[in-house]
Amino acid sequence: MVAGCSNTKTKQSSSDSSLQSQSSIDAKYINLTMVTPKTINPITNTDKSVGYIMNLVYDSLFTIDENYNVIPQLVKEYNIAQDGMSIDIKLKDAKWHDGKNVTSNDVNYTIGLIQKSADSPYNEFTKNIASVNIKSDKDFTIKFKARYAFSIDSLIFPIVSQNHLDSKDVNDKNNNMIGNGKYKIESYTEREGMVLSVNKDYYEEVPKTMKNIKVGMVPNEDARTSMVMALDSDITNVTLNDLSKFQEKEFNITKYQGRDYECVLFNYNNPFFKDVNFRKAIAHSIDKDRIISEGYMDDATPVNFPLNSKSKYYNSEMKDLEFNKDKAIECLAKVEYANVNSVNQNDNKVKNQKKSAKKNSKKLTPEEEAKAKKAEEDRIKKEAEEKKNREKEEVKKSLSEMNLKIIVNRDNSERIKTANIINENLKAIGINSTINQLSDKDMENALNSKNYDLALVGWKLSIIPDASSIIASSGYTDDKLNGYMSALTSSTSEIETKKAYKDVQTYIKDNATFISLAVRNNYIVSNSRLKGKITPNDFDVYEGISNLDIKSNESN
């Protein structure tokens, strides 16, 4: 599903023929692993490794392509109502692996099962669904509780069989053996694992070279990695920490854009951050290129907004606030501290009232009144200039004495490196800062109590391209942004949504409400005995596995 392939680099083995003899791998199959499942029901399962396998067995109404955009899967035709409150859908001529048709009743049953399963990873996606109106075996209408721009993007849950699950134990493995995807479950035991065979009756054409798959059971995620290292499994997703173990000729490394988003938050309880010029000064001072190369060791894709950079809603034409020391200093010179000299302003007001009262007690000639008026205007102008100069000096003094508190999780080495770079960048424009490395609990407490000035944090981007929760969590709000966000979430067409998102992204950039840094890259490691290209993504690491073949000398 959520496909987001980035650059792919391949390291080929010069001795492929030796690999088979070095391992217990079954050369006729593509060999995968999953943690021993509690259930193989794709709706109630909560283990990622199991979910990746079941994505091969079950299809969804819609799925996500390699650019993180929604596309139809089981859906043949669809039409969104003009008011955005419903969607009419016609299904493709898909069949279950037992030969029966996938029907509207299966969709209705699946939605009901998800809504009853509070722990389902798909539960959130169905909360806006009010009802399903079945018109025929292939035609139905989904009605929504509220208008929502990303209603289609939410329909990416796998469809399960009503016939095999209704009024039965939904978690019993024997009731979950029949799917509708490109692969069907040939056999499954905890001891022998699972064998997936090519579904030759799939509703769309599949590659002629498509291979069967054998899935081994392992106790935990670490074992999945170890199996590939030992050449006993062909493919797995790995963390950056494990990646260095695979820099050998036996493996292919595929890099793709994940969903871990990194950014810098401002504390708006600090009056300086309420000044857009101060925020822009911070933004212009930060060297993002250096952060990507040194902080994240080129293991991230730079972004200027919390969306995957390949999304159709991401404004790639929008230029970020560039790293420019001179512009940063120019912005600092424009900073105004609204609360400076508030006591003096009140004192001056009282004095002016007394002076005016005293002057008004004496009757003046027209010439004297004109002269007095001119003198008063000059005095007010002079006082205004003096006040402005005092405030400038006060701001300069405050900036020179400022020591911004930067908080960062002590267990995240990349963010610590980034914090040190930001510390150096700020010092270059005359702003001092101190880095506080905190535990998970202390980090959470500091964020909740607003005990920071800058915070280096991360979010897991939603599968649905809705950045509203991240924007809300940034702490910045005003009527104009609220208006843009309302227009975004209530838009009813792709054109409207793109326009609204463009307005939101431009406004956030122009006002430097927070600083987007990057989306982290993820990695898939595969045995070099395989050939072909896959397009993994954070939601479905085996996306495109049907395109893989086994080198001829490996399958003999």
Predicted segments with their positions:
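Extracytoplasmic/peripheral linker and loop segments enriched in polar/acidic and small residues
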Residues: 434-443, 467-529, 555-556
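Long beta-strand-rich cores associated with HINT superfamily self-processing modules
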Residues: 528-556
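Surface-exposed binding/hinge segments that line
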Residues: 79, 124-165, 187
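Ligand-site clamp/hinge motif
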Residues: 201-244, 432
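Gly/Pro-rich hinge or "lid" segments in bacterial periplasmic/extracellular proteins
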Residues: 48, 156-212, 222, 326-330
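Append "and occasionally in soluble cytosolic enzymes with long acidic Gly/Pro-rich linkers
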Residues: 274-421, 554
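N-terminal lobe/hinge region of extracytoplasmic solute-binding protein
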Residues: 32-80, 112, 178
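Aromatic- and charge-enriched surface segment that lines or borders ligand/interaction sites
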Residues: 76-118, 272
